[in-house]
Amino acid sequence: MTINNQPEPTNEQRRIIYQARRGLKELDFYFEPYIKELYLTAEAAEQESFAQMLTHEDPDLLDYFTNQSRPEDDAMWALVNKIKTWRHSKSLS
């Protein structure tokens, strides 16, 4: 276990964590805390949805997180909403 009670990431998880660094402040608002606090302990299906999400272009991701459009994949859309809800509730506390 790492210092923040997260398991040590596998090489594949490290690759995904690296890919989550987008450089777009609006996306980093969601991705950085998710990676730090939830990703490594998420179910395998959620981790796969997150990996799939990262294959999308930044403008598309921004549209998903601002409700301008939605991905075709329902699991990915559910994850977008989970991350948004979690992150916004975290911001208020």
Swiss-Prot record:
Pfam families: Sdh5. Keywords: Chaperone, Cytoplasm. InterPro entries: SDH (IPR005631), SDH_sf (IPR036714), SdhE_FAD_assembly_factor (IPR050531). It is found in: Cytoplasm. GO terms for cellular component: cytoplasm. The keyword Cell membrane does not apply. One of its GO terms (biological process) is succinate metabolic process. PANTHER family: FAD ASSEMBLY FACTOR SDHE (PTHR39585:SF1). Belongs to the SdhE FAD assembly factor family. An FAD assembly protein, which accelerates covalent attachment of the cofactor into other proteins. Plays an essential role in the assembly of succinate dehydrogenase (SDH, respiratory complex II), an enzyme complex that is a component of both the tricarboxylic acid cycle and the electron transport chain, and which couples the oxidation of succinate to fumarate with the reduction of ubiquinone (coenzyme Q) to ubiquinol. Required for flavinylation (covalent attachment of FAD) of the flavoprotein subunit SdhA of SDH and other flavinylated proteins as well. This is FAD assembly factor SdhE. It comes from Psychrobacter arcticus (strain DSM 17307 / VKM B-2377 / 273-4).
